[in-house]
């Protein structure tokens, strides 16, 4: 039950009534009419901008139009007050029965409460896509958690979602990996090695070298590089991807598809060659020279005639090269082919979750997706800013020793999955995140993950108290739904909790539409806080205690309220991929 959608429909019906009576012209554009929470909760339960956004088109004074619309809305028994504020906003105060119906809906729908049928087709979300050249660091973790939570969020809103990881296994960096692993292989066979500059020095490749020695013995030593390199490269990539998958599993990150870059460039150029043919058929490829970039020239810029894609026709700043001087495909050409492949697999909305250093990538890829899909698909690129590791407010040194750094697994082992996931989502993705290893394990209000999980655990602690105080009573959601008298919930704290529960479907929907899972984290903190505040009031005022052995009526009503609120906390935590414990240990 979404009261915002419900009363938006009611506002539109009222506008239609005004049109039928001749007080509004026909054919008004209602697409910008919304119903949302008022900026100040003391003004009412809902607010609509209808009079403001329609006044100009209707050639009416917004305040006068607001008064006419408010008069029409007052005829609805579910609306106890409709008042015009400021330049024409209409604030609505709802009858208590509306919120009582919300609690009943939350109890009856359980984990499906708030989950919607968001319009739009299949979504493909690509996230993590860390190079398979070493362990994941904390920055990778932020993109991983953000992408996974966004996938959960869109699925909860009703969109079909494919979760994808792009394995960068065709670039020069995997040859560097292979040569580094080969040195560790020689070391495993007893040779003393020196790792030259430009290769990966980390100890994480020692086990790879040992497994190579176990698998191949000394056979690779007798082979020239062009023979051993592809074998070691595949072996090392598989070993790195196994390590990355283990790290992802440790924080609950999952993918449906692991897509290999190498598969794009198969026989005769594979899917990248197909892409160039498709772009040529559209007249979007030409031979030309690019002007020199402004400022300092990048190392890879060449003043020569090149094979170019007309990306500037689709919103990019300049056209882009598709072939290198040696005739091989550019990284950009491979990226376009990959995104075209996602679209051909059925996704009409593509989301890439990348590090903040990929800002220059956004316009060119959005232009490319528009071109290859004839405007049928859109690309949203979500950039995740840096993570600063702190301990009790002091910066943590990221490097442990030469070639080694603080890995994501190090942080998982220290603070656990839930703390990482919640805190990575407690800031907007494009804001730098300070992650304090000491604060995220505190048991206090200042630690959001503890505070929200404690709110959910309280749902079960009051249930245990009720069973002890009123033995033999049935406190299941079905029983509470059947006979709890919700009309006794009149305290401001109870009303606040009901309002917050009623907001959950809208929060879920708006967070999904904006691709912003942090909104769920903020909402959960506010909702858990409302329960904790009411609980604390009951410690001082016995008549407000949730469980009152001498007042069965209020006990059952408050347990119904807490059960509904706890269900919303569990649902929101599931979207974030954070556990909802029944008790805190």
Curated annotation (Swiss-Prot):
Give the family from UniProt: Belongs to the class-I aminoacyl-tRNA synthetase family.
Q: Which GO terms describe its cellular component?
A: cytoplasm
Q: Know the name of this protein?
A: Arginine--tRNA ligase
Q: Where is this motif: 'HIGH' region?
A: 130-140
- Please tell me the species this chain comes from: Methylorubrum extorquens (strain CM4 / NCIMB 13688) (Methylobacterium extorquens)
User: Entry's InterPro entries?
Assistant: aa-tRNA-synth_I_CS, Arg-tRNA-ligase, Arg-tRNA-synth_N, Arg-tRNA-synth_N_sf, ArgRS_core, DALR_anticod-bd, Rossmann-like_a/b/a_fold, tRNAsynth_Ia_anticodon-bd
Enzyme category, top tier: ligase
Q: What EC numbers are recorded for this enzyme?
A: 6.1.1.19
One Gene Ontology BP term is: arginyl-tRNA aminoacylation
- Report the locations given in the UniProt record: Cytoplasm
Q: Where mainly found? A: cytoplasm
Which NCBIfam families does UniProt cross-reference here? argS
- Reaction(s) catalysed by this chain's protein: tRNA(Arg) + L-arginine + ATP = L-arginyl-tRNA(Arg) + AMP + diphosphate
> Which HAMAP family has this protein been placed in?
Arg_tRNA_synth
Q: Which UniProt keywords apply?
A: Aminoacyl-tRNA synthetase, ATP-binding, Cytoplasm, Ligase, Nucleotide-binding, Protein biosynthesis
- Give a yes or no for keyword ATP-binding in this entry: yes
Q: Name one GO molecular function term.
A: ATP binding
Q: How does it assemble?
A: Monomer.
């Amino acid at each position: 039950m979404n009261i915002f959608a419900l009363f938006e429909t009611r506002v539109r019906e009222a506008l239609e009534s005004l049109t039928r009576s001749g007080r509004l012209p026909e054919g008004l554009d209602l697409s910008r009419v919304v119903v949302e929470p008022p900026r100040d909760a003391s003004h009412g339960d809902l607010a609509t901008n209808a009079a403001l956004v329609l006044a100009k088109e209707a050639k009416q004074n917004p305040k006068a139009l607001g008064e006419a619309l408010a008069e029409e809305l007052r005829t609805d028994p579910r609306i106890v007050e409709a008042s015009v504020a400021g330049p024409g906003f209409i604030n609505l105060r709802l009858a208590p029965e509306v919120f009582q119906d919300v609690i009943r809906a939350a109890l009856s729908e359980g984990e499906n409460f708030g989950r919607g049928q968001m319009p739009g087709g299949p979504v493909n979300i690509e996230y993590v896509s860390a190079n398979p050249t070493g362990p994941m660091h904390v920055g990778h973790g932020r993109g991983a958690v953000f992408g996974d939570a966004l996938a959960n969020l869109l699925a909860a809103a009703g969109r079909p979602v494919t979760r994808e990881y792009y394995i960068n296994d065709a670039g020069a960096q995997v040859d560097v990996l292979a040569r580094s692993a080969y040195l560790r292989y020689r070391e495993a066979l007893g040779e003393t090695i020196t790792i030259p500059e430009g290769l990966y020095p980390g100890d994480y490749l020692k086990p790879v070298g040992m497994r190579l020695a176990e698998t191949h013995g000394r056979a690779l030593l007798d082979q020239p590089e062009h023979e051993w390199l592809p074998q070691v490269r595949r072996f090392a990539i598989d070993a790195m991807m196994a390590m990355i998958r283990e790290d992802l599993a440790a924080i609950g990150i999952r993918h449906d598809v692991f897509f290999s870059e190498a598969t794009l460039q198969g026989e005769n150029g594979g899917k990248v060659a197909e892409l160039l043919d498709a772009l040529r058929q559209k007249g979007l490829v030409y031979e030309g020279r690019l002007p020199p970039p402004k400022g300092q020239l990048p190392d890879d810029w060449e003043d020569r005639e090149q094979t170019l894609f007309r990306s500037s026709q689709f919103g990019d700043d300049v056209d882009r090269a598709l072939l290198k001087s040696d005739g091989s495909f550019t990284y950009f050409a491979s990226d376009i082919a990959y995104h075209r492949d996602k679209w051909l697999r059925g996704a009409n909305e593509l989301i890439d979750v990348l590090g903040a250093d990929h800002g220059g990538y956004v316009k060119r890829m959005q232009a490319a997706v528009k071109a290859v899909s004839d405007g049928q698909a859109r690309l949203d690129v979500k950039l995740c800013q840096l993570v600063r590791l702190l301990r009790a407010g002091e910066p943590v040194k990221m490097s442990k020793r030469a070639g080694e750094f603080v890995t994501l697994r190090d942080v998982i082992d220290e603070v656990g999955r839930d703390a990482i996931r919640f805190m990575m989502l407690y800031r907007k993705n494009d804001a730098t995140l300070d992650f304090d290893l000491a604060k995220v394990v505190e048991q206090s209000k200042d630690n959001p993950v503890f505070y929200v999980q404690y709110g959910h655990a309280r749902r079960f602690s009051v249930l245990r108290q009720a069973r002890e105080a009123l033995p033999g009573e049935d406190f299941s959601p079905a029983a509470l739904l059947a006979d709890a008298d919700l009309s006794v919930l009149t305290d401001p704290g109870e009303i606040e909790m009901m309002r917050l529960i009623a907001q959950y479907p809208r929060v879920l929907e708006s967070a999904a539409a904006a691709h912003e899972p942090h909104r769920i984290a903020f909402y959960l903190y506010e909702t858990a806080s409302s329960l904790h505040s009411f609980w604390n009031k009951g410690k001082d005022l016995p008549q407000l205690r949730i469980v009152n052995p001498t007042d069965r009526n209020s006990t059952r009503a408050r347990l119904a309220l807490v059960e509904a609120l706890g269900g919303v906390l569990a649902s929101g935590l599931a979207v974030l991929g954070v556990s909802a414990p029944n008790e805190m240990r």
